[in-house]
Each structure stands twice: as structure tokens, then as C-alpha cells.
Amino acid sequence: IREESDLFADRHEALRLDYAFTEFFLVSSIYYYYLQQRQEAIISIDNIQEDEALSDTNQLLYYHYLKGSASLVAANTPEERKLREFDELYFTWRTAVKSKHPYFEGNGMQGLANLMASPSNFEFFKTRRTHALDQFDFPVDSLFPLRLAQLALEKFREYNDLYQIAGAYVSIGKYLNAHGRYQ
């Protein structure tokens, strides 16, 4: 289909085709991820042409959220991979706030909370991404990941998405377990 996509003379039809291709590759990468086929998921998401992903805000946010939350990023070291995951999720959160997309605002916060649930990971990001963490309206202390997960829960309640609400509770539980505070 891509080989003959230049046959779409109408700009609106060409944009719709770009949207469909982007959606196809986003969904494909999710399926590969859930099948634990990480390389295939990366290949699928890398098939998305940046200008196509950037043309629709929802797709842009989903693209960056998937890359960060599913670890569909290229990196040479585990530390570099964690930083890239963080950057993708932070971009998702920041862009969602600016564009008023509460669903992705919550997803970005929940993804960041999951990355920082363990004390060692929190310290890692606290030293390497201080400027980003300072953008949130609460102290950057050991409770920071818990607060992020709780804010994500609030967003998902506003959005009334039961699946995401359950995921936020999992993130809160993950933090509490990692800190020996779960009873």
C-alpha cells in the first residue's frame, strides 16, 4: 500500500492514510510487546515516520508513551535505556499537560512512578534528571514516585477508566512493596 500511496492526490486522503499506517504500527508494537517479542515491537514502532506520528496529538502521545513504558528504545547500556525510557515518559506527561490530554497525563505519571518505584532507581533518576523532576509541584523526596502514582490514579478516576485505575493501584502497591510499607 505504501508503494502506491502517492496515488492519493487528495491531501485529506493522504493524511488519513498516514494516520492509518501510524495506527497500524502502534497497535502492532503493542501486540508484539504483549507477546514478549521486544525486537519485533521495536521494529514495528520504528516503522512510524516521525512526521506521521507528529501530525496527530493522540498518536504522538501514544507513540512516546509506548516507547517509554514498554522500553522500546535503543540504548547501548542499561543506564542509557532507563534514561531514554524516562525521557519518553516525561515528554508524554509534559506534552499531555500542555495539550490538555488527561489520559496521557496519567499514563506519563504512572510510567514515571513505575520507573522510580525502587529506592535505587529513584536515586538514579534524581541525580540524572533533577531538572525534569523539579517540574512537578511537589517535593522531590523518597515519596515522589508514590505521589506520581496517586496523581495518576486521580487522573484515571476523572477519566473513569477502570483498567487504568487498576494499573495505578498496581503502581502504588509496587512502590509500597519496594519500600517495605505494604501491610
What is the meaning of each model-derived region?
Residues 41, 82-85, 89, 145:
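Single-residue signature of alpha-solenoid repeat helices
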